[in-house]
Every structure is written in C-alpha cells, then in structure tokens.
Regions:
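Active-site neighborhoods and metal-handling regions in enzymes and metal-associated proteins
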Residues: 1-333
Length: 333
C-alpha cells in the first residue's frame, strides 16, 4: 500500500516536472511511508521525507526514533540525525536538493527552520509546491482506506452510544467523556486484533472531549468539565478529533436532551439544523462542486432567519482537515 503511493507520487512528480519533493507534514509522511509515533516539531525535531522522482527516497529522522523508523518506514534509506552532532538534520539536504532543478515543498506544513535552510540552498524561483499533488492523491480513497473509514465509523458509533447512555440528570460532564473514551478504545482494540497486523498501533482514544451542556451549549468547542447536567438541558457531544482509528479520522457530532426539552425553542433550532443537513445530503452527488453542497445547506439556514453559517463539512482521511472542504470557494468536483 505505501509502496504503491510512493510510486504514484514519483509518477506525478515526473509528470509535473518536479525533481524532488520535501515532505514534512506528519500525515503525509505516514500516508507515503507508514512511519508514525515519532516526536514532532513541538520538540524541535524535524523529520523530513525526501522523494526524488527517479532516485531513492530518504527519510531524515532523529536517532532517538531510529528503531521505530526501521520497523515502520517503507523507504529506500533512513538518515538518522542527533542533537549536536555535525549538521544534524541539515546534513543530507544539500546533496539531495542541489541535484534538483525544481524542488517542491509543502508551504503550509513545513517548519520555518527547515524552510529557511532550504532557501539558503536554492533560489526561490526553483521552489514550487507539492501540496496539490498530494491532496489529489489523498482525495481518492483506496479499498484499504475505505475499510479503515468503516471501522472508524464503528468506533465512532460505540463512543456515541456510550456517551448517550452516560448522560443523565445529576451526572458531571467529565463522566460522559470517560465513557466515550473507554468505549472507543475497547471497540478499536477489538477491530485491531480482528483485522490488522500492525501490533504497534494503539487502540486508545485520545483527545480532550468536546462537549457542552445547559447554558454552555453555544460554546462550540467547550470541553468536558465538572459541571453537573440537569433534566431538560441540551447536551452537545462532538467527536471531531476523538474518532481516530488506525490514524483514520472522522468528524461528527450529536445533540441530546435529558428526558425532555425544557426550552421548546431549542427544538425549533435543531429542526433547522436537521433540514440544512438533509439539504446538503440531497445536493451531494457526483458531478457537483463542493461549494454547491455548502450553498444548499446555507440557504436553509439563512432562509430560517439565521446568519450565513460556517462551512458545511470537510473530507475525511488521515488528517483532521482534508480536501475537499464543503465551503464557499472550493470548486472541487
């Protein structure tokens, strides 16, 4: 699977006249090589994948993660680097870049320290972007990715079912978060053992639960707290970020009420939300643009007297934000 993707990228590089691609986005490195669970730039440690259109691929990664790279990464060569030794992660770049006429980077996903060094090596007119190429590749899901998506959906359903069951009058919000995390982890573990060979992939659900209840319901990204939920209150559960099975990410949310809807005006608002979603689903089909789906959804919301809404949705995959997005300006068909 990873070798197929790497070869497809090489083919696209050759077609687009790009000699070497400098891949620094963690999700793209995983997508192309299968390498994951290494420390990132938050700890000042660059990991760089160099993909030449007709030469061996090179993975530059910290020595502290070398054993992980050797076990997971499908690349031609691994170049480890260590703090304070020689030129560190810079050592390999001159030879790999200087042989190239056109070098493609990920402008929105390259650490500034890496970008500055590359600009010392070559002139700006030799730089281009590889992001559109990778986005187009990742939009079309393989059969393996579709299986991951279905299994991620099963994990998501397990979390939502557990969260709904935990919601009750007198319960604190964080108890719901514990329930969703445990249910997701157990379902993921079952699926990993039944369908996958990678014993290093963790089943643990890890994300700070987004949820809100009562008078905090309009705080979109409110986190689970010690607040005690009460009868008649709305409870919002969001799983954008939490549903991450085998690195495949899904995003969705649901709203519940405890026993009854105390404020009946909330039911009217919820009905608009459901109608807007149905409008988007009705518009979604082959041959339409992403922004037209958003427009159908937005028309319902504005028609009900509300302001122009935030984007309708986004694609799913190995990143939290994937192409295309259901938003004004995205003309992807």
């Amino acid at each position: 699977m990873f070798e197929t993707r790497m070869n497809a990228l090489r083919h696209r590089l050759g077609k687009d006249g790009i000699d070497v691609a400098v891949i620094t986005d963690d999700d793209n490195i995983y997508y192309l090589t299968g390498y994951y669970d290494y420390l990132h730039m938050e700890f000042g440690r660059p990991t760089i994948l160099m993909v030449h259109r007709d030469a061996p691929s090179v993975l530059i990664t910290p020595t502290i993660d070398l054993n992980t790279a050797e076990a997971a990464a499908r690349v031609d060569r691994i170049a480890p680097w260590n703090d304070g030794m020689g030129a560190e992660w810079r050592a390999e770049l001159p030879a790999l870049i200087n042989i190239a006429k056109r070098v493609a980077i990920e402008p929105d996903h390259i650490p500034s320290v890496v970008r500055r060094y590359i600009r010392e090596l070559i002139s700006p007119d030799r730089l281009t972007t590889v992001t559109p190429v990778l986005n187009q590749m990742r939009m079309i899901k393989s059969s393996e990715e579709l299986q991951l998506a279905r299994h991620a959906g099963q994990v998501a359903n397990a979390m939502m079912t557990a969260g709904r069951a935990a919601i009750s009058d007198g319960v604190q919000e964080f108890e719901v978060a514990i329930a969703t995390s445990q249910a997701g982890t157990r379902k993921a573990a079952m699926l990993l053992e039944a369908h996958y060979d990678d014993t290093n992939m963790s089943p643990n659900t890890h994300f700070l639960q987004i949820m809100a209840s009562g008078d905090t319901i309009t705080k979109t990204h409110h986190r689970a707290t010690t607040r005690i939920m009460r009868r008649g209150e709305p409870v919002f559960l969001c799983f954008c970020g939490m549903t991450n099975f085998h690195r495949f990410k899904l995003g969705f949310d649901r709203t519940f009420w405890i026993d009854e809807i105390a404020d009946t005006s909330q039911a009217d608002v919820y009905a608009v939300a459901l109608a807007s979603q149905n409008a988007a689903l009705s518009a979604l089909r082959p041959g339409v643009t992403a922004e037209s789906v958003h427009a159908a959804y937005a028309d319902v919301i504005q028609g009900a007297g509300y302001e122009y809404p935030f984007r309708c949705g986004r694609a799913t995959g190995f990143s939290y934000l994937e192409t295309p997005q259901l938003v004004t300006g995205d003309t992807t068909i």
